[in-house]
Structures are given as C-alpha cells and as structure tokens.
C-alpha cells in the first residue's frame, strides 16, 4: 500500500524555472514571482509521521527512551493524517448539504464515526455502509483508542503501567502479557490492545508498533477507497498539491 508514500515536491524543476522571470537588462534582481499551492494536510502529516517513524527506528539501538519519544510523535501524526484525510474527502467529494455533519470543526465527531459516515455523505459507492466488525476496522478503532487514552487519560487506575526488572536495582522494561505472574491479577488487556498488540503505556511504544499502526491506517484507506469505488485516492487526489506560478507583470 502506498497511500502516503512520498511524492517529489519541488519548486526547482524545469517547469518552474522556465517560468521565472530572468534578470532585467540593467542587471538588477528580477521581480518576485508568487507561487501558489493547495496543501494536502494528509500528505504533509503522513510524511512527517514517516520521518519520525524512521528516526525512531534509527534511534532504538542508542536510546530506547528517545526512540519511544519519536515513536509517540509518529503515532500522533499518523492519526492526525487519518483525520485530515477523511475531513478533506468529505469537503472534496461529499454532498454540500451533508458535509457539515462530519467536517464542522465546531461540532467534531469521533474519528471512527466519521469513517463510518463518509460513504453516505459522499453519496456513491458500492454500498452505503461499511462492515466495521471486519478487518481492518477493529484494529483501526484500537489505534484511535490509544491516541484517545493519551488525550483523555481517565482516573489513576486507567493509567497504570507495569514494568519488569530481573533483580532489585536493575534496569526495567515494559511488562509483556506473557511475563505477568499468574497470581498478579494483571490482565493482558491491561497491558496491550488485544487485536493490534499496541501497548497502553505510552512509554512502551517502539518502532515495531509504528509498523503495525501504519499497516492498519493504510489498510483502512484501501478499504474505504474500495467502498467509494476508488474516489478517495483517484488521481492521487488525497496527496495532490498543485502548484501555480504567478509571474510578475512587466
């Protein structure tokens, strides 16, 4: 899946250079040209997520804490890109009388609800509804739930994290489900989300969890695109950032 893979974006190519005004005959600086583009927040944020994803992987051998910090930033950006994708799609593709149902920032809906409603707002596709009990939707719900648990932390008992040390005074690592003592009362679902294995403890997030997150997001984009008969990504609509050069008037 290449829904968010980088697309070269430069203003120094020949198409741009050929339109720039040369220096005037007096040898002075040319008049300034105005460059106008339409930003795709999905594309922008997804590329940022990929960069932090890569940096987290590179940092892992040097410092797990630094790697985890980068991983948390990457996950937040992956989720933000998902939100940008569906809100932009609602505006670009949706019926004008329904767009505000899911794309009004003054009345935000839970992200998973927006994914559910988008096919109906667009008003076309092979089916008006999505089976959210089938993969990748339960996994996508867990990715979103993890982000929500960071922004809506809940009471202390919902914020507990568990670690394991081989001996007193030794360094400690996040406790994995199979490492929990049988008589500890620690349930596996208190440590990780059951379908994705993503850790509930933000400090336990590692690069391989980002691999899972990206795979889930890309799978959700593919599934939604199929439901919309390809309208979501047709002609790279979701990533396209067209550029116009407005040359100065002589």
Show where each model-derived region lies.
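Charged alpha-helical initiation segments
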Residues: 1-72, 238-249
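Polyanionic, low-complexity intrinsically disordered segments
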Residues: 29-42, 47, 155-250
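Charged, amphipathic alpha-helical oligomerization/scaffolding segments
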Residues: 48, 77, 81, 138-149, ...
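Surface-exposed polar/charged interaction patches
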Residues: 52-55, 59-62, 92, 96, ...
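A structural signal for well-ordered alpha-helices, especially hydrophobic packing surfaces
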Residues: 53-56, 60, 85-86, 147-154, ...
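Short, hydrophobic, well-ordered secondary-structure elements
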Residues: 67-93
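Flexible secondary-structure boundary motifs
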Residues: 87, 91-188
């Amino acid at each position: 899946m290449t829904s968010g893979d980088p697309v070269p974006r430069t203003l120094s190519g020949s198409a741009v250079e050929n339109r720039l005004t040369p220096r005037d005959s007096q040898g002075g600086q040319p008049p300034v040209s105005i460059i106008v583009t339409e930003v795709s927040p999905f594309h922008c944020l997804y590329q940022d997520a990929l960069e932090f994803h890569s940096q987290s992987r590179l940092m892992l051998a040097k410092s797990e804490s630094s790697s985890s910090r980068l991983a948390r930033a990457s996950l937040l950006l992956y989720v933000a890109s998902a939100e940008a994708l569906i809100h932009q799609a609602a505006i670009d593709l949706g019926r004008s009388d329904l767009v505000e149902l899911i794309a009004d920032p003054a009345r935000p809906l839970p992200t998973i609800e927006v994914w559910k409603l988008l096919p109906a707002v667009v008003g076309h596709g092979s089916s008006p509804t999505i089976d959210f009990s089938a993969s990748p939707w339960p996994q996508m719900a867990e990715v979103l739930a993890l982000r929500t648990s960071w922004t809506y932390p809940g009471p202390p008992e919902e914020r507990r994290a568990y670690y394991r040390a081989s001996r007193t005074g030794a360094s400690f690592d996040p406790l994995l489900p199979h490492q929990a003592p049988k008589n500890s009362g620690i349930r596996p679902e208190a440590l990780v989300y059951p379908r994705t294995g993503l850790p509930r403890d933000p400090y336990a997030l590692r690069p391989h969890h980002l691999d899972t997150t990206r795979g889930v997001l890309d799978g959700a984009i593919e599934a939604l695109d199929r439901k919309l008969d390809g309208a979501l990504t047709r002609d790279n609509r979701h990533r396209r950032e067209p550029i116009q050069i407005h040359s100065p008037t002589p």
